[in-house]
Amino acid sequence: MKLLAVRRLLRIQRVVIRYQLDELLLELPLPFWLRALSWLLPWRWLPRRPLALSRGARLRLALEDLGPIFIKFGQLLSTRRDLLPPDIADELARLQDQVPPFPEDQAIALIERQLGAPVSQLFARFDSQPLASASVAQVHAAQLKSGEEVVVKVVRPGLKPVIRQDLAWLFLLARIAERASADARRLRPVEVVSDYEKTIFDELDLLREAANASQLRRNFEGSPLLYVPQVYWDLCRHQVLVMERIYGVPVTDLATLADQRTDMKLLAERGVEIFFTQVFRDSFFHADMHPGNIFVSTRTPWSPQYIAIDCGIIGSLTDEDQDYLARNLIAFFKRDYRKVAQLHIDSGWVPADTKVNEFEAAIRTVCEPIFEKPLKDISFGQLLLRLFQTARRFNMEVQPQLVLLQKTLLNIEGLGRQLYPDLDLWSTAQPFLERWMRERVSPLHLLRNLQQQAEQVPHLSQIARDALERLQRPEPPRESDARDQWPLRLLGAALIAAGAVQGLAPLLATWPAWLMVGGGLYLVLRR
């Protein structure tokens, strides 16, 4: 494990040198001591040819070079446009999660181990050539004994140790960034990596994806808007997922959609309707709706139906978040900025002591230029993004569910405008939101709320008792976990080795080498 970590560290070091990412880091407002420490790096004493690439391109190429786990991390970062400069976010959005397939014998062995039977007994036909291959899994076509055409998704073998290793380095870099820079602390890098850790391990559990797909299918059962393939539960395990095979037109294949006379305006509007239905009716939305996961049914082009696959990432909102979000959007389009500011404070998204007048003025400054455009040119996703960026200046806590929502909305909106450039998102969404708000205050909804609250009454005394016990019980002092220390010690070992190499080089000064050795010894021996 430690040998793997050292090899991985050296690989990261080579990529940093190749794409001159240290120069990129020095563009940040680093403290003096960290900027001075950067001169201890051996490669900074050697002549280097400047790269004719933008900083975003260098970062994207470096992540692609480091492999699938870093690629997926870059893809996650690209959705955090509230944190990143636009040029870097745009480049990271170009990252492609395409890797060579792993051998068919490994896929078959894993399927047979997970399902406890030979593939020949499980399927009438199993295609050894995968339909698609990505960093986490690959997909094979097959046919069940009963005749149904299916796809078999298989998790890539040996991923977990590599993921844990890469996450350890990402956490280390995030902690160093938080300690070194106030600007970095504002971006909460440790929280971003934690979010990625949850996402990547969720994607490794195909039973979770199967459950998500089943729920989404049930939510839209019989709907003309969205179709979700059937899951074959008796053939699903943590590393194997078997689903109905679908046949549709990729949503980006505009030529084929036009050839079959698809109603593009209705298709674009239905995409928006699906999004708002998932968010507000179901509070359960597909949060990975990029074009590769969306198809269009060929059955009824005059009344087009979407097909969604890959339900590994799902978002949900609490009742309170749904309510505040709907009221925020309605207030935005009425240009009631004071209400928007007050809703953010009431929801707890920004601190309670935030000055409403100042927050209102900041929102107005950002949003007024947007509303000078025609409604069809206004981006809902960009509106939310600008709002998050403004709220960040007022210490808005990161809301993971809202980040997923904003990312999904940007995808749906971009897709809708690609299908039908004159799509007026607000005209499509407004009736839905206003109807949903009316239903929230209907007598039937209020009665349901009363019933739910009445069910909690018998448990109130136990809840109060548990709360008092927690207050009386002192929290044990936190101890540093030794597992969190080993990346620092490995980094120290690398510094010692690099310092020794530099000290032996006759063309370079030796004082940086001694400092590197000293710093490395400190990291290795510290408790």
UniProtKB/Swiss-Prot annotation:
Pfam families: ABC1
Segments forming domain Protein kinase: 125-488
Keyword Repeat: no
Alphabetic keyword roster: ATP-binding, Cell inner membrane, Cell membrane, Kinase, Membrane, Nucleotide-binding, Transferase, Transmembrane, Transmembrane helix, Ubiquinone biosynthesis
Main localization, broad class: membrane
Swiss-Prot/TrEMBL GO biological process terms: regulation of ubiquinone biosynthetic process; ubiquinone biosynthetic process
Membrane topology recorded in Swiss-Prot or TrEMBL: Multi-pass membrane protein
Location(s) in or outside the cell: Cell inner membrane
Regions that span the bilayer: 23-43, 504-524
Positions annotated as active site in the UniProt record: 288 (proton acceptor)
GO annotations of cellular component type: plasma membrane
Functional pathway: Cofactor biosynthesis; ubiquinone biosynthesis [regulation]
Enzyme class: transferase
Chain residues that bind ATP: 131-139, 153
NCBIfam families, per the entry: PRK04750.1, UbiB
Family: Belongs to the ABC1 family. UbiB subfamily.
Function: Is probably a protein kinase regulator of UbiI activity which is involved in aerobic coenzyme Q (ubiquinone) biosynthesis.
Protein name according to UniProt: Probable protein kinase UbiB
Organism: Ectopseudomonas mendocina (strain ymp) (Pseudomonas mendocina)
